[in-house]
């Protein structure tokens, strides 16, 4: 990586921390005010939108969304692949009003961000205490059904930071909730963001995340004994979609992970081969009385 690239990587990393802290503080104020007027359920949406616009302005990032019409009818449980810090930026763009999130309990104690999440109704999960986590999720399900809201879950359970077009194995919590409440699952697939952010390779580029929101999947006829199979099918569908979307388009001013460079080369080769395949083949006729010299000349000219 060049000196300028390394400088940009650290500068943008610092800017993200500042943006998170600033928007977290804003979120604390917004959560208090929204709670006072009986609108606590809007605090996360308001703060998420703020973070989206701040990051877009500061870092030259954006989000392109396909299938947003699939979020029109609540209640539902949204699930998405979990990759990096930029997931918060993506949330800021598509987060529906009245939606809330689940998060690991350790985030609750992060200054500003954790305080905002606690005040705005986030459901914190301690995975080392299974029954407590189940009770918390059931509480979230009750709220979602009663008030026709949405719940956002990252079924991978942690950020993958992967530079491959794949996802970690899914935990089953979101699917148990959906089956129990008979509410649909809405899969959200985000393009691989290692071309935008990757601590492993020192990547922090400007660019655009591509988000595809799939159609809601009914759980009306889903039984408990089929939840594992159902979760695997949903994951397979999401991974297939991820492979279709590929990597996030980036303006490479730091560096790129090798997997993304290889993928770009393969895509280029496919386009070239497709173009060659679709080009009409010139028709060349050679009469019987053409001598060997002229025949060779004709073939050479055709090539």
UniProtKB/Swiss-Prot annotation:
GO cellular component labels: endoplasmic reticulum; lipid droplet; membrane
Enzyme's top EC category: transferase
UniProt GO MF annotations: 1-acylglycerol-3-phosphate O-acyltransferase activity; 1-acylglycerophosphocholine O-acyltransferase activity; 1-acylglycerophosphoethanolamine O-acyltransferase activity
Catalysis: reaction(s): a 1-acyl-sn-glycero-3-phosphate + an acyl-CoA = a 1,2-diacyl-sn-glycero-3-phosphate + CoA; a 1-acyl-sn-glycero-3-phosphocholine + an acyl-CoA = a 1,2-diacyl-sn-glycero-3-phosphocholine + CoA; a 1-acyl-sn-glycero-3-phosphoethanolamine + an acyl-CoA = a 1,2-diacyl-sn-glycero-3-phosphoethanolamine + CoA; 1-hexadecanoyl-sn-glycero-3-phosphate + (9Z)-octadecenoyl-CoA = 1-hexadecanoyl-2-(9Z-octadecenoyl)-sn-glycero-3-phosphate + CoA
Family of the protein in this entry: Belongs to the 1-acyl-sn-glycerol-3-phosphate acyltransferase family.
Keywords associated with the record: Acyltransferase, Lipid biosynthesis, Lipid droplet, Lipid metabolism, Phospholipid biosynthesis, Phospholipid metabolism, Transferase
Lineage summary: Eukaryota, Fungi, Dikarya, Ascomycota, Saccharomycotina
Chain residue ranges for the region called Disordered: 278-303
Subcellular location: Lipid droplet
Motif (HXXXXD motif): 82-87
E.C. no: 2.3.1.23, 2.3.1.51, 2.3.1.n7
InterPro entries: AGP_acyltrans (IPR004552), Plipid/glycerol_acylTrfase (IPR002123)
Lipid biosynthesis as UniProt keyword: yes
Residue ranges, compositional bias (Polar residues): 284-297
Domain of life: Eukaryota
Comment text on domains: The HXXXXD motif is essential for acyltransferase activity and may constitute the binding site for the phosphate moiety of the glycerol-3-phosphate.
Matching CDD domains: LPLAT_AGPAT-like
Protein name per UniProt: 1-acyl-sn-glycerol-3-phosphate acyltransferase
Annotated GO biological process: CDP-diacylglycerol biosynthetic process; glycerophospholipid biosynthetic process; phosphatidic acid biosynthetic process
Protein purpose: Acyltransferase that catalyzes the sn-2-specific, acyl-CoA-dependent acylation of lysophosphatidic acid (LPA) to phosphatidic acid (PA) in lipid particles. Together with ALE1, plays a central role in PA biosynthesis. PA is the intermediate, from which all glycerophospholipids are synthesized. Can also acylate lysophosphoinositol (LPI) and lysophosphoserine (LPS). The fatty acyl substrates include 18:1-acyl-CoA, 14:0-acyl-CoA, 12:0-acyl-CoA and 10:0-acyl-CoA.
Biological or metabolic pathway of the protein: Phospholipid metabolism; CDP-diacylglycerol biosynthesis; CDP-diacylglycerol from sn-glycerol 3-phosphate: step 2/3
């Amino acid at each position: 990586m060049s000196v300028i690239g390394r400088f940009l990587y650290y500068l943008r990393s610092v800017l993200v921390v500042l943006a998170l802290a600033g928007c977290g503080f804003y979120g604390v104020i917004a959560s208090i005010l929204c709670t006072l007027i009986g609108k606590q359920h809007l605090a996360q949406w308001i703060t998420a939108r703020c973070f989206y616009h701040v990051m877009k302005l500061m870092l030259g990032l954006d989000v392109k969304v396909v299938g947003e019409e699939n979020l029109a009818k609540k209640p539902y449980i949204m699930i998405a692949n979990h990759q990096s810090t930029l997931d918060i930026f993506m949330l800021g763009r598509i987060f529906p009003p009245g939606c809330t999130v689940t998060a690991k309990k350790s985030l609750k104690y992060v200054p500003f961000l954790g305080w905002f999440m606690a005040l705005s109704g986030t459901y914190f999960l301690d995975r080392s205490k299974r029954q407590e986590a189940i009770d918390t999720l059931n509480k979230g399900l009750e709220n979602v059904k009663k008030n026709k809201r949405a719940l956002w879950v990252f079924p991978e359970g942690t950020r993958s930071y992967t530079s491959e077009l794949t996802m970690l194995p899914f935990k089953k919590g979101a699917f148990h909730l959906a089956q129990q409440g008979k509410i649909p699952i809405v899969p959200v697939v985000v393009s691989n963001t290692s071309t935008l952010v990757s601590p492993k390779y020192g990547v922090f580029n400007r660019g655009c995340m591509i988000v595809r929101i799939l159609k809601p999947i009914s759980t009306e006829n889903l039984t408990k004994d089929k939840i594992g199979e159902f979760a695997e099918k949903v994951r397979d569908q999401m991974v297939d979609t991820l492979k279709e979307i590929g990597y996030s388009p980036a303006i490479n001013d730091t560096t790129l992970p090798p997997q993304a460079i290889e993928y770009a080369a393969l895509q280029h080769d496919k386009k070239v081969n497709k173009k060659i395949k679709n080009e009409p083949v010139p028709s060349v006729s050679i009469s019987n009385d053409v001598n060997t010299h002229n025949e060779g000349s004709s073939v050479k000219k055709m090539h």
